[in-house]
Amino acid sequence: MVAATTLEAVDIMGLMKLLPHRYPFLMIDRIIDIDGDDSAIGIKNVTINEPHFQGHFPEQPVMPGVLIVEAMAQTAGAICIRSLGASKPSLVYFLTIDNAKFRKPVVPGDQLKIHVKKIKKRGNLLKFACEALVDGTKAAEAEISAMMVTGD
């Protein structure tokens, strides 16, 4: 018999301890199903109260794709920092976006589930495959890379 693995979660207060981002640029509300720095699912509850909807677009609000990619990067960055515990770096810098595709508009009322999976790690450089889903349908995907740095 194989023992079941219990995956972990981080709420908004935990995220604010891990990430330097704050309103209006904190793009995730919580992270669930954390498996070390290998994978996780970030949750973003999209609401009309977000400032970007004032101009993108007032009559037909759509979440900007670049903010969906930022939510992917924040999810990946948070699990990287969390996996290091007390020896966490000062920052995780977003380095590249590859193969980004936007497949479905994300609108107020949607809940984004941002799946991130580590596909490569070399030293302090990491690469993740990411998908953002709404109701099980892929809204966006990208590969992102990041660099963890210390404040030394």
Swiss-Prot record:
**Record GO biological process:** fatty acid biosynthetic process; lipid A biosynthetic process
- Supply the Pfam families for this chain: FabA
| Gene3D superfamilies documented for this protein | Hotdog Thioesterase
Q: Give UniProt keywords alphabetically.
A: Cytoplasm, Lipid A biosynthesis, Lipid biosynthesis, Lipid metabolism, Lyase
Top-rank taxon, per record: Bacteria
A molecular function (GO) held by this record is:
(3R)-hydroxyacyl-[acyl-carrier-protein] dehydratase activity
Any GO CC annotation of this UniProt entry: cytoplasm
Q: Does the keyword Zinc apply?
A: no
Q: What is its EC number?
A: 4.2.1.59
Q: Does the keyword Zinc apply?
A: no
What is the catalytic activity of this protein? a (3R)-hydroxyacyl-[ACP] = a (2E)-enoyl-[ACP] + H2O
Q: Where in the cell is it found?
A: Cytoplasm
User: Which residues are the active-site ones?
Assistant: H56
Q: Per its database record, what is this protein's job?
A: Involved in unsaturated fatty acids biosynthesis. Catalyzes the dehydration of short chain beta-hydroxyacyl-ACPs and long chain saturated and unsaturated beta-hydroxyacyl-ACPs.
Family under the similarity heading: Belongs to the thioester dehydratase family. FabZ subfamily.
HAMAP family named in the record:
FabZ
Full protein name: 3-hydroxyacyl-[acyl-carrier-protein] dehydratase FabZ
Species of origin reads: Mesorhizobium japonicum (strain LMG 29417 / CECT 9101 / MAFF 303099)
